[in-house]
Each structure stands twice: as structure tokens, then as C-alpha cells.
């Protein structure tokens, strides 16, 4: 199983020094990948609860860096690790602009890009960027169509229900062909079908492994029904540790636990067939130095298992 680490793109350590420092440390520690998230607002009165825990949005989101620009900085200070988004909201910019940005990143990183796309959870952000909250699934499908077309055609045009692209020469191609892998965050039945039929893989969040493997089995079954080879799909699991000083009850894992319990969870995830697991320590009260030390102990513990 590959092991990744989230960059400090949220909170007080969302700085150039933070991004560069974690990037270099991750590569030195043997991490396989670095990941960024996406926010455009931190509303004082959100219209929807945060979908995890007590429903309160983490204070770290009040300070947020652009995920793709942060990834560019990380790429400039690393040579080996892959660079992924978990998740980039697929609908907050026109698909053609998204295609150009992702293609540029894949070229500049030498083919180290993993594109993780999602739809978000907060209508406020959609209002702020003037994108309708309703009809997100159809908008995502058309966005995926445009990404694929832009990456695979020398001459490309698109006429769809939402977007029109006049015929154009596409001279810049991704380093990875036919394009960087696109993974989707999804939990509804329709979303899981979209992963199975259209994506290179799935971006779930940490949950009990029995439930996780059940959802993954659903995706693989749908992929086979669609005529795809299920073995070509991969899963990259996000874990946001809520660290406790004392050992948590087993039923609380992975919602809370000690570092050792999260190491055990990661080992069990590997045995359950998870292809990649990455941890995001950005919501902890620890200093950046303490989180870097913890990241070192985490990967050492998982690799030793």
C-alpha cells in the first residue's frame, strides 16, 4: 500500500515555508504522495453542517491556500512523490480552464499528477462562484467528457447542454497518456456508479473497514457490469486522525484514537486491499514540527507492520 501525506494548505501553517518544509520532509521520510484540499469560503453561518463529526466546520478552513498553486510549489521542491488533490471541486471553474491547469501541472511535474475530483458539501461556496447547486451530477459528467476530449484529441470541439468549446488545436498534451488518472470522491449510489464507469478510482474518507470494503465491492461490481476491468481501478483513502492521549474504544476507530491505533488501522486497510492511504494532520492542535515528527512515526509504524 502506498502512503501519502496532506500538505498544510489550511490553517496557520498554510504558508510557503509550511508547504516547502512538509514537501521535503515527506520525500525524505519515504512518503509516496502529497495531497491538497479545496475551499473557497469559511462562512460565519454555513447553510449546511459540516458532514463529519459534530457538524462544525474546522477552524483551519478559515485560512486556505489554492490547491493547484500549492501543488506547483510542492512539485518544485520534490522529485519523486506523486501529487494529488483530495479533493478539487470539479465545478468551480469552466472545464476548459480546469483542463488547461491540470494539463500544465502534469507537464511541469513530469507526470506526477493524480486528479481527485469532488462536488463539495456546502451550497454557500457554489453561490460564491456563481455555479448552480442543483444539477451537479450532470455538470460533473460533462466536465469529465471535456477533460477526456481535451486530453485525447489534437483537434477538439464540444457542444453540450452546459458548455460550448469552438473547434481548437490542442497542442499541449499531458505527460501521462491518455491523461492523468482521475479519481472521484463519492458516497451516493449514483456517485459510486460514476466512479465505476468513468473514473480511474475512488477517494473515500476513513470509515470502518467492513463498510469501506462493502462500498468498494459495489464499485467493482458496477465496473464489471459496465465492461471495465475492475483490477484497473484503485482506492486512495483519506484519514483525518483525531488523536487521543488514551486508547480509544474499538468502535470509535477511525473517528478517534491514539497514533498507534491509527497505525493499526492503516495496516488493516492494507490487508483489506486499500491501494493508497494518506493522512491529513492539519486539523490537529499540534505545531508543524510536531506534526512532521508524528508523520515520521506514522509511516515508520505502518511500514514496520
Stretches with model-predicted labels:
Residues 1-305:
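Active-site-adjacent structural elements that line small-molecule/cofactor binding pockets in enzymes
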Amino acid at each position: 500500500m502506498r502512503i501519502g501525506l496532506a500538505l498544510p494548505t489550511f490553517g496557520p501553517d498554510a504558508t510557503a515555508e509550511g508547504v516547502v518544509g512538509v514537501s521535503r520532509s515527506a520525500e525524505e521520510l519515504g512518503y509516496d504522495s502529497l495531497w491538497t484540499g479545496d475551499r473557497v469560503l469559511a462562512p460565519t453561518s454555513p447553510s449546511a453542517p459540516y458532514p463529519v463529526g459534530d457538524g462544525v466546520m474546522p477552524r483551519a478552513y478559515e485560512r486556505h491556500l489554492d490547491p493547484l498553486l500549492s501543488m506547483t510549489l510542492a512539485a518544485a521542491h520534490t522529485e519523486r512523490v506523486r501529487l494529488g488533490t483530495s479533493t478539487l471541486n470539479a465545478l468551480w471553474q469552466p472545464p476548459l480552464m480546469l483542463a488547461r491547469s491540470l494539463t500544465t501541472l502534469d507537464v511541469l511535474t513530469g507526470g506526477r499528477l493524480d486528479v481527485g475530483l469532488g462536488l463539495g458539501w456546502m451550497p454557500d461556496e457554489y453561490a460564491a462562484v456563481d455555479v448552480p447547486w442543483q444539477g451537479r451530477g450532470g455538470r460533473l459528467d460533462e466536465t469529465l467528457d471535456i477533460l477526456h476530449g481535451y486530453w485525447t484529441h489534437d483537434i477538439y470541439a464540444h457542444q453540450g447542454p452546459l458548455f460550448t468549446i469552438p473547434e481548437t488545436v490542442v497542442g499541449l498534451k499531458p505527460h501521462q497518456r491518455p491523461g492523468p488518472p482521475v479519481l472521484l470522491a463519492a458516497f451516493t449510489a449514483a456517485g459510486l456508479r460514476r466512479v465505476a464507469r468513468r473514473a480511474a478510482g475512488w477517494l473515500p474518507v476513513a470509515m470502518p473497514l467492513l463498510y469501506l470494503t462493502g462500498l468498494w465491492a459495489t464499485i467493482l461490481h458496477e465496473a464489471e457490469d459496465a465492461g471495465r476491468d475492475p483490477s484497473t481501478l484503485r482506492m486512495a483513502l483519506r484519514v483525518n486522525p483525531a488523536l487521543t492521549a488514551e486508547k480509544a474504544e474499538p468502535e470509535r476507530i477511525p473517528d478517534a484514537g491514539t497514533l498507534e491505533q491509527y497505525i493499526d488501522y492503516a495496516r488493516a486497510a492494507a490487508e483489506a486491499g486499500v491501494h493508497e492511504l494518506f493522512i491529513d494532520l492539519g486539523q490537529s492542535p499540534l505545531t508543524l514540527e510536531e506534526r512532521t515528527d508524528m508523520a515520521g512515526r506514522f509511516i515508520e509504524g505502518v511500514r514496520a507492520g
